[in-house]
Amino acid sequence: YTIDSLTEKGWREAEFLSERLTKLEIRDFYVSPLGRAKDTVSPTLKKMNRTATECDWLREFDVLIDRPDVTDKKIIPWDWLPQDWTRDERFYQYDHWFENERMLASDLKGHYDYVTGKLDELLAKHGYVRDGHCYKVVESNEDTLVFFCHFGLECVLLSHLLNISPMVLWHGVCAAPSSVTTLNTEERREGIAAFRMSAFG
């Protein structure tokens, strides 16, 4: 970011967000180390007299690649032109999107695995252990966890929890600043949980 903080409008949005979040029973807050995320969470923490755990892996997913439409510098891996990314069928597949030559050159999968591995470590501490494409419920609970992060990173987390290619999310959804995405765990059979998204952006 050019300015790693909030604009005047951004501070107003963070205030509105705090009015929404202070009505919830929140177990833990987790926040990116970047100034924008920390400033966005600050009104909520102040009103609730709480603190947030800062996680380096929640910073924006700013791994740089050689994107086809930008020839003079490396750039973030989303916001491709539709005519470029939609031609590679691998981008639509949860287990093949990273095989594109441009992604391989920047080890996108390695960075992706680091972030999603950290997410799984955190979820395991809250009783949910990754098991294939689902989660083994070690300790069933209704804890609400709140993450203050960034669009590109959010799509990485969602792609892992929902087993979707991040390319589809990076190019198919749009999240406004200070917006809220909600996921719930669903345990249709005892001991096995899956994540379902009930609201985005």
Question: Where do the PLM segments sit?
Answer:
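Flexible, glycine- and charge-enriched loops at secondary-structure boundaries
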Residues: I3-T7, Y112, L169
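Short glycine-rich phosphate-binding loop at a beta-alpha junction
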Residues: I26-P33, C134-K136, T144-F147
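Short catalytic helix/loop segments, enriched in acidic residues and glycine
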Residues: I3-E19
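Alpha-helical packing segments of well-folded alpha/beta enzyme cores
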Residues: E13, L17, A37-T40, H111, ...
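Phosphate-coordination/substrate-recognition cap region in phosphate-metabolizing enzymes
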Residues: L17-D95
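Internal catalytic-core helix/loop-beta-alpha segment
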Residues: W97-C134
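Acidic, low-complexity terminal tails and accessory targeting/binding regions
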Residues: F61-I75, D79, V129, H133-T144, ...
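Short, conserved phosphate/pyrophosphate- and ester-handling motifs at nucleotide-, phospho-/glycolipid
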Residues: H150
